[in-house]
Regions:
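Glycine-centered hinge/linker elements that transmit conformational signals in sensory
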Residues: 198-203, 239-267
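Hinge/lid segment of periplasmic solute-binding proteins
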Residues: 35-45, 117-169, 221-224, 304-306, ...
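Short, solvent-exposed loop/beta-turn-alpha elements that line the ligand-binding surface or hinge
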Residues: 43-46, 133-146, 210-216, 232-252, ...
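Extracytoplasmic/periplasmic substrate-recognition and gating elements
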Residues: 76-77, 100, 182, 254, ...
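A structural signal for short loop-to-beta-strand junctions that line the ligand-binding cleft
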Residues: 101, 109-113, 139-179, 315-318, ...
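N-terminal secretory signal peptides and thylakoid transit peptides that target proteins
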Residues: 1-21
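Extracytoplasmic "Venus flytrap"/periplasmic binding protein-like
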Residues: 73-146, 181-183, 283-284, 294, ...
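Long, aromatic- and glycine/proline-rich binding clefts that accommodate carbohydrate-like moieties
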Residues: 149, 153, 306, 358-410, ...
């Protein structure tokens, strides 16, 4: 069944109050319908910044130390404001759950919160976050200095709803020592077909358990498998037509299953493939750019990074973006919002985005960030920066259907850990995704 709905029309209807539960990108808590975003322009003239604010973070890319350092430097520069760093979860889903709980209780909200690049729109629909435009103007934030594709992710209806923070793409990580021992070139494979030819050589010449480790499914499947799907001309969806059961999509996922069972050169991580790779369990993996610094610190071998491989149908523009931004909740006082904006401005200054990138591997979000010293120390970060030019917008089915990410992960688990029939599993997933559309999206659009 084709879900015939233009993406732009969908978003315009949603923006008029079509319903907050209509849109979701990562897996996570369901969201009650809110009052919607306020159309009243915010005015902070005469507002004094709060003396203390809470900053909720899940410390993406193991960034707690660099976050503490930025807070200390901000407080030294602004002695009248104290920033309390709160660990609000171990990942984007957990921090979203905590934020939704605080919203429901109408208490305990932070002044600044880390939000997934695809969670912000749900918060926008619920009226949970404020537009930043008046604060951007008042504080003279140089919005045009942000990397366009990253900052534009948070623009809607002519307003800016968040600023980019820990932004990432998946990268292909490989063990240079293993590749050399197997007589392979020192680069990422151009396609998954090429890596399938390399994999037996890696297994034969190294002590690694696997040539490749698939990322953990619960947190990554819906995101990273888009790469496999796109390379074969498949997708989770095209616009609003669910296409996960197409011949191309099935072929892509069949190849992934074959790597685990038929050809037996790949494993599936139970928790974090970056850690498995750094420990030497596999010769290669796919993981976020935010895993880069951790891998480089932990690995006892020479680490290589490259663009994600293409497939038989597409060899470029097969990489999705991801990561997190920072938003300011609507349910806190104007004084807290102003103080949060001042800290947000500080965190996103060029030198601080460079420092954050150096500490984590995430992409610097400012064009003017001086990355010379960072790249001299960690040249691998440039690969992530370069890959940004060939990324692709995520599929609508993952980005806007509530609960779709979990369903994709469940389907991937059946295929990659239970050897379920791929076509049958994708047919079932299609029915589930169409059900989500008909139940949670279509009724809202008629409202």
């Amino acid at each position: 069944m084709k879900l015939a709905l233009d993406r732009r029309l969908f978003l315009s209807l949603a923006g008029m109050g079509a319903g907050a539960a209509a849109l979701s990108a990562c897996g996570g808590p369901s969201t009650a319908v809110g009052t919607g975003p306020s159309e009243t322009a915010l005015n902070f003239d005469g507002v004094t910044p709060a003396a203390s604010i809470d900053f909720w973070s899940n410390h993406p890319g193991k960034s707690q130390d660099v976050e503490k350092d930025m807070i200390a430097r901000f407080e030294a520069k602004n002695p009248g404001i104290k920033v309390n760093l709160v660990t609000a979860g171990a990942n984007y889903e957990e921090i979203a759950q905590k934020f939704q709980t605080a919203q429901a209780a109408k208490s305990g909200l932070p002044a600044l919160v880390v939000l997934s690049d695809v969670w912000w729109f749900r918060y926008y629909l619920n009226g949970n976050i404020i537009p930043l435009d008046s604060l951007i103007s008042q504080l003279d934030v140089k919005l045009d200095d942000f990397r366009t594709s990253l900052v534009d992710d948070y623009k809607y209806d002519g307003q800016q709803w968040a600023l980019p923070y820990g932004r990432s793409t998946p990268l292909f990580y490989y063990n240079k020592d293993h590749f050399a021992a197997a007589g392979l070139p020192d680069r990422a494979p151009a396609t998954w077909q090429e890596f399938a030819e390399w994999a037996p050589k890696l297994k034969a010449t190294t002590r690694a358990q696997y040539a490749f480790m698939h990322p953990a499914l619960a947190g990554y499947a819906g995101w990273t498998l888009q790469n496999n799907l796109w390379g074969e001309g498949g997708s989770w969806s095209r616009d609003w037509e669910v296409t996960c059961d197409s011949a191309e999509s099935v072929a892509a996922l069949q190849a992934a299953q074959d790597s685990v069972y038929k050809d037996a050169w790949a494993g599936v991580s139970s928790k974090e493939s970056a850690d498995d790779f750094a420990a030497g369990l596999a010769s290669a993996t796919v993981s976020s750019t935010g895993s880069l610094i951790g891998i480089l610190k932990s690995a006892t071998f020479n680490v290589g990074v490259g663009f994600l491989p293409g497939g038989s149908k597409a060899k470029t523009e097969v990489c999705p973006t991801g990561g997190a931004g920072l938003g300011i909740p609507s349910g806190v006082t104007p004084e807290e919002q102003l103080a949060a904006a001042m800290f947000l401005q500080f965190v996103t200054e060029p030198e601080n985005t460079a420092a954050f990138s150096a500490a984590t591997g995430y992409m610097p979000t400012r064009k003017s960030a001086d990355m010379t010293a960072v790249l001299a120390k960690t040249p691998q970060i440039k690969t992530a920066m370069d890959q940004l030019a060939v990324t692709r917008v995520q599929d609508n089915a993952r980005a806007f259907l509530p609960g779709a990410d979990q369903e994709m992960a469940k389907a991937a688990a059946k295929i990659l850990t239970q050897e379920a029939d791929v076509k049958t599993t994708m047919t079932e997933l299609k029915a589930t995704l169409e059900g989500l559309y008909n139940t949670d999206v279509k009724p809202k659009l008629k409202a």
